[in-house]
Amino acid sequence: DKLIGSCVWGAVNYTSDCNGECKRRGYKGGHCGSFANVNCWCET
């Protein structure tokens, strides 16, 4: 998967709609994962 940003408000590269942002970039979708769901990962 491709890390594009953070799912935490106020964090660097905050992404309000992780799934939508990933789709906009051409990925199949995305989800908030990793430790404590802080990162936005796009499905590659």
Swiss-Prot record:
SUPFAM superfamilies, per the entry: Scorpion toxin-like
Subcellular location: Secreted
Alphabetical UniProt keywords: Antimicrobial, Defensin, Disulfide bond, Fungicide, Immunity, Innate immunity, Secreted
Disulfide bond annotation, renumbered to this chain: C7-C32, C18-C40, C22-C42
GO biological process: defense response to fungus; innate immune response; killing of cells of another organism
Chief location category: secreted
GO cellular component: extracellular region
Family: Belongs to the invertebrate defensin family. Type 2 subfamily.
Physiological role: This peptide has potent anti-fungal activity. Has no activity against Gram-negative and Gram-positive bacteria.
Protein name stated in the entry: Defensin heliomicin
